[in-house]
Amino acid sequence: MRIGFLGLGNMGAPIALRLLASGHELSVWNRTEERTKPAIHEGAIAAATPAEAELGADAIITVLLDDAAYEEVFFGVHRLIDSLSPGLLHILCGAISPALCQRLAVEHANRGIDLVAAPVLGSPIDAAEGRLSVIAAGAGEAVARARPLLESFSQHIAVVGTNPQQAFAINAGSIDSPTP
């Protein structure tokens, strides 16, 4: 599968390397260009912008740092939201708030883009060894499309619902447990 991969930090870099080792084609972008070099050394193509990484991709995977990074890439200076193609699969692995995930879900739905929220649990070593756990949420068909990619870098995938923000709410511990 052809993947646009955004965010090659401590978690993103080993995830990208696992995807490359699984035979996927990656076009990679990172705010700090130096962080793309290990993936490029393993066969990834460097992209100058997030939109260039997405061009011609079947899916994009984002492992950006926080809400501010996602805001900058999708709605700020890069305006990636305007470049995404209908039918694209977006697997969102970075740590963001449930509120921003909901905003992204609405914007994606309005453009015919499948969003699967997939925050990861584990360390960079776990990522490098394919031992991450993933909390996934999204439409059933989208999660099914995402599963082979998620399996490239995780050993456990817990699907928690059809609304992408559910995954980040659980990841953030912001869902109250019902009391008996």
Predicted segments with their positions:
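Class I S-adenosyl-L-methionine
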Residues: L20, K37-H41, E71, A105-A109, ...
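Short glycine-aspartate micro-motif
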Residues: R2-F5, H90, L115-A117, I135
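Rossmann-fold dinucleotide-binding core
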Residues: A95-D176
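NAD(P)+-binding Rossmann beta1-loop-alpha1 motif at the extreme N-terminus of oxidoreductases
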Residues: M1-T62, L88, P124, H156-A158
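Rossmann-fold NAD(P) dinucleotide-binding segment
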Residues: P50-L115
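Active-site-proximal alpha-helical scaffold in enzymes
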Residues: P178-P180
